[in-house]
Amino acid sequence: MPETDRRVLVLAPEDNICVACQDLDADTELVIDGAQLRLPQAVPTGHKLARRDIAAGEKVVKYGAPIGSARQPIGAGAYVHTHNLGSDYIPTWDREGREMR
């Protein structure tokens, strides 16, 4: 397996995300799967970031299983959360109570 920075954890080889093991600031440089990436935004401890580019509509995979679909293109190293990840199983709502599909 290619080199990956110890500040992130890859949970399963087929995952297209990894998990931050510590708070990561915007502009942090990491090596993920042998590729050098600069984080476009901060990622809190325990949260997800993209291991590679993820296309809009593509399944986001964690623990080797799909956890939802990308609502928009997600670049490698980008923070993956409710702003760009939608559930395929239940409606996703914004803070004002509007459904976001």
For every predicted segment, state its role:
Residues 2-101:
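N-terminal small-residue-enriched
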